[in-house]
Protein backbone atom coordinates (compact mmCIF):
# COMPACT_ATOMS: atom_id res chain seq x y z
CA UNK A 1 0.00 0.00 0.00
CA UNK A 2 1.34 3.40 -0.99
CA UNK A 3 1.75 5.89 1.82
CA UNK A 4 -0.22 9.15 1.44
CA UNK A 5 1.69 12.38 1.31
CA UNK A 6 1.04 14.62 4.30
CA UNK A 7 -1.07 17.73 3.89
CA UNK A 8 2.05 19.75 4.62
CA UNK A 9 3.83 17.96 1.77
CA UNK A 10 0.92 18.57 -0.58
CA UNK A 11 0.84 22.23 0.42
CA UNK A 12 4.50 22.50 -0.51
CA UNK A 13 3.83 20.92 -3.92
CA UNK A 14 0.82 23.11 -4.65
CA UNK A 15 2.70 26.31 -3.79
CA UNK A 16 4.59 26.14 -7.09
CA UNK A 17 1.53 25.58 -9.30
CA UNK A 18 0.49 28.38 -11.64
CA UNK A 19 -1.82 26.66 -14.15
CA UNK A 20 -5.33 25.29 -13.62
CA UNK A 21 -4.54 22.23 -15.72
CA UNK A 22 -1.54 21.15 -13.65
CA UNK A 23 -1.51 17.34 -13.20
CA UNK A 24 -1.12 17.68 -9.42
CA UNK A 25 -4.48 19.42 -9.16
CA UNK A 26 -6.07 16.51 -11.00
CA UNK A 27 -4.19 14.01 -8.84
CA UNK A 28 -5.39 15.51 -5.55
CA UNK A 29 -8.93 16.28 -6.74
CA UNK A 30 -10.19 12.92 -5.45
CA UNK A 31 -8.34 13.08 -2.13
CA UNK A 32 -11.11 13.09 0.47
CA UNK A 33 -9.15 14.79 3.22
CA UNK A 34 -10.74 18.11 4.16
CA UNK A 35 -7.31 19.74 4.44
CA UNK A 36 -6.37 18.70 0.91
CA UNK A 37 -9.65 19.99 -0.51
CA UNK A 38 -9.10 23.28 1.30
CA UNK A 39 -5.60 23.53 -0.20
CA UNK A 40 -6.99 22.84 -3.68
CA UNK A 41 -9.59 25.57 -3.25
CA UNK A 42 -6.89 28.02 -2.11
CA UNK A 43 -4.66 27.04 -5.03
CA UNK A 44 -7.43 27.54 -7.60
CA UNK A 45 -8.21 30.93 -6.05
CA UNK A 46 -4.52 31.93 -6.17
CA UNK A 47 -4.31 30.89 -9.84
CA UNK A 48 -7.45 32.85 -10.72
CA UNK A 49 -6.18 35.95 -8.90
CA UNK A 50 -2.89 35.68 -10.78
CA UNK A 51 -4.71 35.32 -14.11
CA UNK A 52 -6.77 38.42 -13.29
CA UNK A 53 -3.60 40.39 -12.46
CA UNK A 54 -2.05 39.31 -15.76
CA UNK A 55 -5.17 40.34 -17.71
CA UNK A 56 -5.30 43.72 -15.95
CA UNK A 57 -1.58 44.26 -16.57
CA UNK A 58 -2.01 43.47 -20.27
CA UNK A 59 -4.91 45.91 -20.44
CA UNK A 60 -2.81 48.67 -18.84
CA UNK A 61 0.06 47.81 -21.19
CA UNK A 62 -2.12 48.24 -24.29
CA UNK A 63 -1.53 52.01 -24.44
CA UNK A 64 2.23 51.54 -24.25
CA UNK A 65 2.15 48.87 -26.95
CA UNK A 66 0.20 51.21 -29.21
CA UNK A 67 2.77 53.98 -28.67
CA UNK A 68 5.66 51.56 -29.22
CA UNK A 69 4.09 50.36 -32.48
CA UNK A 70 4.14 53.98 -33.66
CA UNK A 71 7.87 54.26 -32.99
CA UNK A 72 7.69 55.92 -29.57
CA UNK A 73 10.23 53.88 -27.62
CA UNK A 74 9.95 55.72 -24.33
CA UNK A 75 6.55 56.07 -22.69
CA UNK A 76 6.31 57.53 -19.19
CA UNK A 77 3.71 56.46 -16.68
CA UNK A 78 2.71 59.29 -14.35
CA UNK A 79 1.04 59.16 -10.95
CA UNK A 80 0.36 61.78 -8.30
CA UNK A 81 -0.17 61.82 -4.56
CA UNK A 82 -1.22 64.65 -2.31
CA UNK A 83 -4.33 66.15 -0.86
CA UNK A 84 -3.97 69.80 -1.61
CA UNK A 85 -3.04 72.83 0.40
CA UNK A 86 -4.49 71.68 3.73
CA UNK A 87 -2.57 68.43 3.84
CA UNK A 88 0.68 69.35 2.18
CA UNK A 89 2.29 69.32 -1.25
CA UNK A 90 1.21 67.46 -4.36
CA UNK A 91 3.89 65.05 -5.50
CA UNK A 92 4.11 63.44 -8.92
CA UNK A 93 6.34 60.74 -10.29
CA UNK A 94 7.01 59.74 -13.88
CA UNK A 95 8.63 56.41 -14.67
CA UNK A 96 9.80 55.00 -17.99
CA UNK A 97 9.92 51.23 -17.90
CA UNK A 98 11.53 48.85 -20.39
CA UNK A 99 9.38 47.01 -22.92
CA UNK A 100 9.98 43.71 -21.11
CA UNK A 101 8.86 45.00 -17.70
CA UNK A 102 6.66 42.34 -16.15
CA UNK A 103 5.90 43.22 -12.54
CA UNK A 104 2.18 42.65 -13.02
CA UNK A 105 1.11 44.13 -9.69
CA UNK A 106 2.16 47.65 -10.68
CA UNK A 107 -0.94 49.82 -10.75
CA UNK A 108 -2.23 53.21 -9.60
CA UNK A 109 -0.54 53.81 -6.24
CA UNK A 110 -3.87 54.61 -4.59
CA UNK A 111 -5.13 51.12 -5.45
CA UNK A 112 -2.20 49.41 -3.73
CA UNK A 113 -1.68 48.85 -0.04
CA UNK A 114 1.25 50.57 1.62
CA UNK A 115 2.94 47.19 2.06
CA UNK A 116 2.57 46.39 -1.66
CA UNK A 117 3.87 49.82 -2.71
CA UNK A 118 6.91 49.41 -0.47
CA UNK A 119 7.53 45.89 -1.79
CA UNK A 120 7.25 46.94 -5.45
CA UNK A 121 9.28 50.16 -5.14
CA UNK A 122 12.76 48.54 -5.30
CA UNK A 123 11.74 46.41 -8.29
CA UNK A 124 10.44 49.44 -10.16
CA UNK A 125 13.50 51.56 -9.37
CA UNK A 126 15.86 48.74 -10.33
CA UNK A 127 14.19 48.13 -13.69
CA UNK A 128 13.22 51.69 -14.61
CA UNK A 129 14.98 53.35 -17.51
CA UNK A 130 14.23 56.77 -16.00
CA UNK A 131 12.48 58.22 -12.94
CA UNK A 132 11.45 61.81 -12.26
CA UNK A 133 9.76 63.26 -9.18
CA UNK A 134 8.07 66.66 -9.03
CA UNK A 135 6.68 68.56 -6.06
CA UNK A 136 4.33 71.53 -5.85
CA UNK A 137 4.18 73.17 -2.44
CA UNK A 138 1.00 74.17 -0.59
CA UNK A 139 1.72 77.82 -1.42
CA UNK A 140 1.82 77.01 -5.15
CA UNK A 141 -1.45 75.09 -4.78
CA UNK A 142 -3.00 78.13 -3.06
CA UNK A 143 -1.82 80.40 -5.88
CA UNK A 144 -2.78 78.37 -8.95
CA UNK A 145 -5.18 75.63 -7.64
CA UNK A 146 -4.62 71.91 -7.14
CA UNK A 147 -5.16 70.88 -10.77
CA UNK A 148 -2.69 73.42 -12.15
CA UNK A 149 -0.20 72.63 -9.37
CA UNK A 150 -0.44 68.93 -10.25
CA UNK A 151 0.18 69.68 -13.92
CA UNK A 152 3.11 71.93 -13.02
CA UNK A 153 4.55 69.21 -10.81
CA UNK A 154 4.26 66.71 -13.67
CA UNK A 155 6.27 68.98 -15.96
CA UNK A 156 9.22 69.11 -13.54
Language-model segments: residues:
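Acidic (Asp/Glu) carboxylate-rich active-site/surface patches
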Residues: 1-76, 80, 86-91, 95-156
Amino acid sequence: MEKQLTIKGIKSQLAAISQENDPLLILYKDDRRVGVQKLLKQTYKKIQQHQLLVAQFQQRLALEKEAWSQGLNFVAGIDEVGRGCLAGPVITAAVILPHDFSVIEVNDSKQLSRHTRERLYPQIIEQALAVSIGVSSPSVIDQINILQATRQSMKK
